[in-house]
Amino acid sequence: MSEDAAMHVGSLSPDGRHRWDGVTWSPVAPTPALPHLPAWASFRITARASWWVVAAALIAGLVADQAFRVGAFGLGASLALAFLALALVFVARAERLESRLLAGAAAVFAAWLSMRASPWLVWPDLAAGLILVGTAASFARRGTLLNIGMAESAARGFHAMLHWVAGAAWAVRPITAMRAPFASAAPVARGLLIATPVAIVVAALLASADPVFASFLTINLDFGQLLADAFFVLVGSLVMAGLLRSAAAEPLNRVDGPMWRLGATEGLVVLAVLDAIFAAFALAQAVAATGAAGDTLRAAAVTYADYARSGFFQLLWVAGITLVVLILFSRITALNQASTKRAFVLLAETAIVLTLLIVAVASMRLSLYESAYGFTMLRLYSHLFAGWIAVVFLLLAADVGGVFRRRRWFVGATAITALAMLMVLNFANPEALVARFNVDRAASTGKLDPQYLAGLSGDAVSTLLASRPQLQPVQFSQIKNAVCSGPMTYAPNPAAFNLADAEAASARRETC
């Protein structure tokens, strides 16, 4: 019998490239290689966790517990967020200057959490701080805020979430690697497990026989608080572990958007429809301003004063939706020909100009509304949003027009303007501004809403109590009665200490 005849059907050749079918050797089809996941969807890391990572995660958990358990923004919240930024620099050893600057900016926003009391500030400050430390971790090895597109922003966000999920398993590696100490402790653990039921029975019998001994076994523990503390420590530790693992992840290269593109005709039609609607709106504003729309307003039972003071929130929504549409279509529309590209730029720039007109109309209407009904935080922030979105539209106009075409700067520039505005707001103290605007309005018109002013946070108390020279005695008495109902003493838990609340209590003691 020949060697080939002795082979079993289905046997592979020594080199693994042929298979015996009983008659002849047939080539084996190569096994298709599994597709490689993109770097932004992988869990690959460049460094192992050290004991410094374990210590940082534990400390972050303990500090977060102190911040959470007081239930208020204060020193504990500032320290928790600042520690995330410091650990990113000194434990993860962020190499790039930009990453360290972003972590430093997060620490600055963290400081405001114990200096301002307004929820209109502290929540955005917290969000800004967390976004900054996450961005700093993503840029720890590669990348820059000055050259990042929409697709790469989304990819880096997804990449960070993956590593935050896997952070705990990565951070405990130094502990699980200690096999020898655990092996020697195993007999002790088994002995304690065996002794536990015996000890419980004996201790219970002795406690029932001797009240003095029973008093030794009385343990005053708040198990609810204990569970809450354990949960808070766990949350803080997981956040820190995920942040450090994200900084140790394999660096991401440039991420571009999908290759699919919308046809140029479709994109141009969308922009043309938008421009037509906005042009009609601009015509309506011109008609209303000349008084030619009087019959229409009377038929709708709306006075011109009411008309001029209405609709500002809807107009801001229109501006926001238009911004999203322009950004999206400027990225996905196929503009392969010079003529279609010029047409797209013309229509997009026209839409931006008309949208800026809408923003101006919204801001004007809001100003008229404030003159009639006073200032609130929502109205102030609506003004600020209108101003910021106008700046973003100007940036988008420059981007669509081809300014710095070789760099993807629009996303980073937009983020920087938002952070800069929030930082300015922290220094300006918006609740104090609202209080001052309402005091000035009361001095000139006699109209005052003391109940709304009483609902402002400690950021506004000093301004309100210092308004005596500007107001009539009756008006100041209304403000004083409303504001002085707050606490005049301030002795919080150190983790809850807030400078604005401390200054508010001091102002009440001096004036009330």
Regions flagged by a language model, labelled:
Residues 21, 31-92:
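N-terminal signal-anchor module of multipass membrane proteins
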Residues 64-212, 228-250:
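Transmembrane-helix bundle segments that line or gate the permeation/cavity pathway
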Residues 33-50, 68, 89-100, 145-148, ...:
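Juxtamembrane membrane-water interface segments of multi-pass membrane proteins
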Residues 405-407, 422-447:
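Hydrophobic alpha-helical transmembrane segments in integral membrane proteins
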Residues 83-86, 100-111, 194-203, 274-279, ...:
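Hydrophobic membrane-spanning alpha-helices of multi-pass integral membrane proteins
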Residues 218-232, 299-320, 375-387:
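Short aromatic-rich membrane-water interface segments that cap or initiate transmembrane helices
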Residues 1-33:
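Signature of WW domains and closely related Tyr/Trp-rich beta-sheet microdomains
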Residues 454-512:
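Extracytosolic and intramembrane catalytic regions of membrane-associated proteins
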